[in-house]
Structures are given as structure tokens and as C-alpha cells.
């Protein structure tokens, strides 16, 4: 578990910031592992992008215009429940992509996705990705394998939310974020973590203290 969570103030949603068209191989694991022929189908359409904290990547029930491939940072996939509350159902980092519903042939997001740890990456217009998928069976299968892996993550998150103690859920969440970030600090508030786990802030504070005591 990481020590010394750095506290930051809550921010309102912002927009990703475009840099330039990307042509070299990115750090994103999905893109960097593509065959040369499949990568060429995407390369000319990829745009480098800065992803500041709270940047909105997908909004529930709205058409997906862009699919994002993170090189750094972490995105939260959240479900909105009663009275505007949110609970995290999945994480995406440099291992993956957003827009899984696009890969499966749909147009609208089923959840909301935004950046929780700022970073950078690349994006492609959803229509351009659809064109590339139609042009390559191997590309379709490759991205569908990620969709399956992401669905397993979502299933395990649901199981943890329903059965695990808060300390276990928090430890799991911290490790998942750890796998997708660099350094020894997370610029996240206890309140934000509580929102992601769907628990009270006081519960997160107590659980963090318990985990810290176990690490000595």
C-alpha cells in the first residue's frame, strides 16, 4: 500500500486538452502491442492529448465521440445511483482504453468516465475507430480481448463491493491505482476515495489508519 496520500481540493469536470497528431508508438500497452499493420490503421488518426484531473471522457447515455488510450494517469468508470451519488465500477490506465461499447458496436456510454489522476495519452474519433475495426478482423479480436478483461475487472469490483470489508476494498483499490501510476503519492482526497468506494468519508479515514498500522 502507498503511504502519505497527498490531499488535493475537489475540482469541477474539465475537458481534455489536445496537443498534436500522434504518429510514433505510444506508451499505452494496447497500442504499443498492436501488429504493425493494425497500428497503421489507427496511427494517422491518433491525437496526442493532455488529460487533466476531472477531464470528462464519457458521459452516461450520451454518444461517444472519442476513444481514449492513456499513456499515464488513471480514469474512473463510475455508475451514478440515487440522489446523484457515484460509485466506481472500473479503472482504466495505460493498460487499456475507454470506449469499450464502441468496440462492441454501440454508440452511447452506459456509465460516466473521467480522469481521477492526471496524465496524458491519445484519442481517436469513435467513427475512425469503427472504420478501422471494420477493416481488420484481427484488430476487432484484439480489442475484444481487452473488453473481456475489463468486464472481469468490473465483475470482481462488484463482488468486492458486495462481500468485502471496507479495509479490503480500500486496499484493493489502492493497489489497482498503484499499478497504473508512478511515484509514491496519490493526489486524492479521502472524500473522493469514499465516493469511488460508495462509503462514508469517515469510513475511509478509519480504514486508512487501520491499513497504515498493519504496515508497520
PLM feature spans:
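Short amphipathic alpha-helical elements of helix-turn-helix/winged-helix folds
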Residues: 169, 173-177
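Cyclic nucleotide-binding regulatory domains
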Residues: 55-118
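Phosphate-/nucleic-acid-contacting segments
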Residues: 176-216
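Cyclic-nucleotide recognition modules
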Residues: 90-148, 152, 156
Amino acid at each position: 500500500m502507498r503511504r502519505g496520500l497527498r490531499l488535493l481540493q475537489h475540482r469541477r469536470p474539465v475537458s481534455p486538452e489536445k496537443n498534436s497528431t500522434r504518429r510514433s508508438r505510444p506508451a499505452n500497452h494496447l497500442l504499443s502491442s498492436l501488429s504493425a499493420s493494425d497500428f497503421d490503421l489507427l496511427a494517422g488518426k491518433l491525437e496526442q492529448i493532455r488529460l487533466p484531473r476531472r477531464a470528462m471522457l464519457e458521459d452516461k447515455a450520451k454518444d461517444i465521440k472519442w476513444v481514449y488510450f492513456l499513456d499515464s494517469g488513471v480514469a474512473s468508470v463510475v455508475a451514478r445511483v440515487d440522489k446523484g451519488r457515484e460509485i466506481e465500477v472500473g479503472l482504466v490506465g495505460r493498460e487499456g482504453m475507454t470506449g469499450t461499447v464502441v468496440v462492441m458496436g454501440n454508440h452511447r456510454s452506459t456509465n460516466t468516465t473521467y480522469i481521477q489522476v492526471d496524465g496524458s495519452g491519445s484519442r481517436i474519433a469513435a467513427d475512425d475507430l469503427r472504420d478501422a475495426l471494420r477493416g481488420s478482423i484481427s484488430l476487432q479480436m484484439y480489442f475484444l480481448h481487452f473488453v473481456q478483461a475489463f468486464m472481469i475487472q468490473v465483475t470482481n469490483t462488484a463482488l468486492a463491493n458486495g462481500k468485502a470489508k471496507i479495509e479490503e476494498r480500500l486496499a484493493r483499490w489502492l493497489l489497482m491505482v498503484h499499478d497504473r501510476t508512478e511515484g509514491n503519492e496519490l493526489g486524492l482526497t479521502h472524500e473522493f476515495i469514499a465516493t469511488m468506494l460508495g462509503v462514508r468519508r469517515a469510513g475511509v479515514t478509519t480504514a486508512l489508519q487501520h491499513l497504515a498500522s498493519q504496515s508497520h
